[in-house]
A protein has these predicted regions:
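A short, N-terminal "cap"/entry segment at the start of jelly-roll beta-barrel domains
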Residues: 1-36, 121-132
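Conserved short histidine dyad/triad with adjacent acidic residue
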Residues: 38-54
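Glycine- and acidic-residue-biased ligand/ion/polar-headgroup-sensing regions
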Residues: 57-68, 73
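A cytosolic small-molecule/anion-sensing beta-strand core signal
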Residues: 64-65, 81, 100
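Short acidic-glycine-tyrosine-enriched beta hairpin
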Residues: 74-90
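Ligand-binding loop in jelly-roll beta-barrel domains
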Residues: 90-116
Length: 132
């Protein structure tokens, strides 16, 4: 038995933890989830930035259109273009800066429940700024 859908059936929205982030106002997502995996289509208009963060889930991103600058763990910046794949291991700090208009697919396992229902899991989130 299988299920069949179209992306347009799922609402496009800003993730709750990005709503107040002016650097991410152009980042929208549609997502579908099962018990074990979540797939998201990310659409970015005019660029956007998601600060470095971490979560238990493993994540894979495929850039379909556009470019993004990403960091994983060591803070070395890598630029991704259409057709590039970014693999993010569990509990590794990572961040992304979308350059202009971007379309990407993300696959996350296990699903990040916090992004589906709007709460933040305590061990999941943004890198704290260093005090000077």
């Amino acid at each position: 038995m299988g299920y069949y859908h179209r992306w347009e059936e799922f609402p496009e929205k800003t993730l709750h933890y990005l709503v107040d982030n002016p650097n991410a106002k152009g980042v929208k997502s549609r997502r579908i989830s099962t018990d074990r995996i979540m797939v998201s289509k990310v659409t970015v208009k005019g660029g956007g930035k998601i600060p470095r963060h971490y979560h238990e889930a493993e994540q894979v991103m495929l850039i379909q259109k556009g470019r993004a600058r990403v960091t994983t763990g060591d803070k070395k910046v890598h630029e991704l273009r259409s057709g590039d794949i970014w693999v993010i291991p569990s509990n590794v700090l990572h961040g992304v800066e979308y350059i202009g208009d971007v379309e990407a697919f993300e696959i996350v396992s296990p699903p990040r429940v916090d992004t589906l229902i709007g709460y933040v899991i305590p061990h999941t989130f943004f890198e704290k700024a260093k005090k000077s």
